[in-house]
A protein has these predicted regions:
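Bacterial N-terminal signal peptides that target proteins for export
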Residues: 1-7
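N-terminal signal peptide c-region/cleavage motif recognized by signal peptidases
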Residues: 15-17
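Contiguous beta-strand segments within globular domains
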Residues: 21-27, 33-41, 192-198
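Non-catalytic cap/lid and distal C-terminal segments of serine-dependent acyl enzymes
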Residues: 45-553
Length: 553
């Protein structure tokens, strides 16, 4: 195609990087009582709806944002964001084309933790928002300004507004919420650390004062919503046939209103349903096991939170009457709880779980690969490793891009992003007290000693099962159930295939006992989020298992 001189000149002008822009984020005395250590951000967007700060993050549609550490910042001081400040999806502010934009500044404060392991670290103490770096209570933000950015831009943004605390929903006759101070995790962090629960009560719970109920524990990314999406909100508008067809093509999971109507009318088996809340200073989910960086969350959940639920509610306090389900992060969590605490739970239904075999750490093999960003199996044609894809197979984000985003959000593995979350949960502690990097976020070079430490600690669930099946296997018969789509957006089906291969091998002579669980695969083109049953159907499956495993009178 031939370009006219005018069009060619316009394209050249648009592509000229801007090298001299400077943004100053200023903290007025009225907004800051003490010095603060944390992370400062500049957000730039083409629209102000929503606010620019809510348009930046580790996702493929992110608007440009830039981040810098601040230490002992005093009121009245300025934080400079310029062409040397790292960013995403633009690596530098200097690469931003000239034009009109909406801009906003933010300062995320960190908390100092003098941990029991002797390390002192700074990280964001979750405020029950779920480690949302751009929307955390206590953060200082500026007003949104519309400006023209060019080579001479020099803008000052006043960080004069403090984001308010999270408003926790009120209890109802159906849904209750509570938190406890975990003695175990608080001792590790030398700081008060909460565990929480959102409890959904069955129909007739208040009227049947002597009846006890089995418990289904749901686990996953931090939320204040009720288990299984139970809600009364928006239920006056029925699902259209077209919307239902689209939903069922993706997953059998029903809308929250439909589940609520079945639950409140007594059409589901009678369980107490509990969603577990366990954010850490590194991620919105602890990954439910004891961790060198996060602390003893596995013991805290099983020895503190579950006994508290048994104390507060009329549960059947027996392992056969405790079942688990969750998807994605929660899918990994429920398998990990069932496998590592087999005497506490009576079955896990894992949906599209995070990597259950680290030979597919999403896509790559952290035990044998040298780089997390690039495949070098063709020396003259190195290829970028995808991190996410469409159900049709088109790459959405690469590993390099996602890690660039996390490195923009925070240094030292504190981004609250997915890769940093896994690293905090499973990696050893580094010499500086922060999680030891599994790979270099700039180059992608893998540290295999970290990978081997993760394997040795039992976080590679398939490997842990294979090494310990003779002792743990008898306690897991009939208790492991996994479902995933064949085109999971994050390649999580690959690890599930490997897990099934091992578990099915337990039927071979000398390898038993046979695991006697199940695997289900969504085909064709089923994405992340696919499940083969509605939540109502899943509860019926769980109720049948609870009844089968109940002690005989």
């Amino acid at each position: 195609m031939r370009l006219s001189p005018v069009l060619l000149a316009a394209l050249v002008l648009y592509a000229v990087p801007l090298a001299a822009q400077r943004f100053s984020l200023v903290v007025p005395a009225s907004a800051l009582a003490t010095q603060v250590t944390g992370r400062a951000f500049l957000f730039i967007a083409r629209t102000d709806k929503p606010e620019p700060r809510l348009q930046g993050g580790a996702q493929r549609r992110s608007e440009p944002f830039f981040g810098a550490d601040v230490e002992s910042l005093a009121s009245g001081a300025s934080i400079v964001i310029d062409g040397n400040t790292p960013g995403f999806p633009l690596a530098s502010l200097a690469r931003l084309p000239a034009g009109e934009y909406f801009v906003q500044g933010l300062l995320l404060p960190y908390t100092r933790f003098a941990r029991a392991d002797g390390h002192t670290v700074w990280a964001h103490m979750d405020q029950w928002e779920g480690q949302r770096f751009n929307d955390a209570p206590g953060s200082l933000v500026s007003a949104v300004q519309k400006i023209r950015v060019d080579a001479n831009t020099n803008v000052s943004l006043q960080l004069a507004t403090v984001l308010p605390p999270v408003q926790r929903p009120a209890d109802t006759e159906w849904v209750q919420r509570f938190t406890i101070r975990s003695k175990l995790v608080s001792a590790f962090w030398n700081h008060d650390m909460p565990l929480g629960a959102v409890v959904l009560l069955p129909k007739g719970y208040a009227a049947n004062s002597t009846r006890r109920y089995p418990v289904v524990y749901t686990v996953g990314h931090f939320s204040q919503r009720a288990p299984f999406g139970f809600t009364f909100e928006g239920c006056t508008t029925p699902e259209t046939p077209e919307a239902r067809a689209v939903r069922l093509a993706r997953s059998a999971r029903e809308p929250g209103c439909e589940f609520q109507q079945a639950w409140t009318s007594g059409k589901t088996p009678e369980f107490i349903a509990v969603f577990i809340q366990h954010p850490t200073p590194f991620y919105d989910d602890s990954y439910v096991l004891n961790s060198a960086n996060n602390g003893p969350y596995g013991d805290a959940i099983t020895r503190e939170l579950i006994p508290e639920i048994d104390r507060r509610y009329r549960t059947i306090a027996s392992s056969h009457a405790r079942v688990l389900t969750g998807g994605s992060t929660g899918g990994w969590d429920v398998l990990a709880l069932q496998i590592h605490y087999p005497d506490v739970f009576g079955g896990a239904w894992s949906l599209y779980p995070d990597q259950v075999d680290f030979r597919n750490y999403q896509f790559g093999n952290i035990y044998t690969d040298s780089n997390a960003f690039v495949m070098h199996d063709r020396s003259w044609l190195p290829r970028e490793i995808p991190s996410s894809r469409t159900p049709e197979g088109m790459t959405e984000l690469t590993m390099r891009e996602e890690n660039q985003a996390e490195a923009t959000i925070a240094s030292k593995g504190r981004s609250g992003g997915q890769w940093d979350g896994w690293q905090a949960a499973w990696a050893p502690v580094g010499a500086d007290g922060y999680p030891k990097p599994l790979w270099d976020k700039r180059t992608g070079a893998i540290d295999r000693s970290v990978a081997e430490s993760m394997r040795a600690k039992g976080y590679d669930l398939r490997d842990h099962l294979e090494r310990n099946w003779k002792t743990v296997g008898p306690k897991l018969v009939g208790k492991l159930h996994t479902a995933v789509g064949d085109m999971d957006n994050y390649f999580l089906n690959l690890g599930v295939y490997r897990l099934e291969t091992f578990l099915e091998s337990t039927k071979e002579p000398g390898k038993g006992p046979y695991y006697a669980g199940s695997f289900a695969y969504g085909r064709p083109l089923k994405p992340h989020g696919w499940q083969p049953w509605s939540n109502q159907e899943l509860l019926r499956i769980m109720a049948a298992q609870v009844a089968r495993n109940a002690p005989r009178q």
